[in-house]
A protein has these predicted regions:
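Charged, compositionally biased, marginally structured helical/coil segments
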Residues: 1-152
Length: 152
C-alpha cells in the first residue's frame, strides 16, 4: 500500500472516529502534497509526487513543528506547543523509524567503506550512499558534520 493510500485510509478513519485534531493534521498533509503536485505541474518533465517526495515533505513538516513547539514553549504558550507536538506524533506515524545516534554512526562508517571515501573531498559520495539507503530515516543536515568528522 502506497503512502498516499495509507494517508487516505487514515483520513477516512479519523472522519469516522470524529478525531478532530488527527483529521486536521491529515488534511494539512494532504494539502501539502497537493501543493507539491501543483508546483510540479509547471516544471517540464516533472513526474507525479512519489512516496519519497511525500516522506521528504512530511520530514520537513515535522522539523517545522519541532521549531514551532519550541518557540511556543519558550513564549509560554504551552497549549499551542502541545498542539504542535500532537501534530508531530500524527505525522511521524507515516514516516519510517528514525535511526538512533549509534545506528547513524554505524551507517556513516558503512557508507564511507562502501564509497571508498578517503578524504573530505569524497563527502558527496558518502552522502549519496546514505541518501540512497536511508532516505527518511535520518536528518542529513545533522549527519553531514558526522561524515565530515570521520573524513577530516
Amino acid at each position: 500500500m502506497s503512502l498516499r493510500d495509507r494517508l487516505q485510509t487514515a483520513l477516512k478513519e479519523a472522519m469516522k472516529a470524529k478525531a478532530a485534531a488527527r483529521l486536521s493534521t491529515l488534511r494539512l498533509i494532504n494539502a501539502a502534497i497537493k501543493d507539491r503536485e501543483i508546483a510540479n505541474r509547471g516544471e517540464p518533465g516533472a513526474a507525479d509526487v512519489t512516496d519519497a517526495d511525500i516522506m521528504a515533505l512530511m520530514s520537513k513538516m515535522v522539523k517545522q513543528r519541532h521549531e514551532s513547539a519550541r518557540a511556543y514553549a519558550e513564549g509560554g504558550r504551552l497549549e499551542l506547543a502541545e498542539k504542535e507536538t500532537d501534530e508531530i506524533l500524527v505525522i511521524e506515524e507515516f514516516l519510517p523509524r528514525q535511526l538512533t545516534g549509534d545506528e547513524v554512526e554505524a551507517a556513516v562508517v558503512d557508507a564511507i567503506a562502501a564509497s571508498g571515501a578517503a578524504s573530505i573531498r569524497d563527502m558527496g559520495k558518502v552522502m549519496a550512499v546514505l541518501k540512497g539507503k536511508y532516505t527518511g530515516q535520518m536528518d542529513f543536515g545533522a549527519v553531514g558534520p558526522a561524515v565530515k568528522a570521520r573524513l577530516g
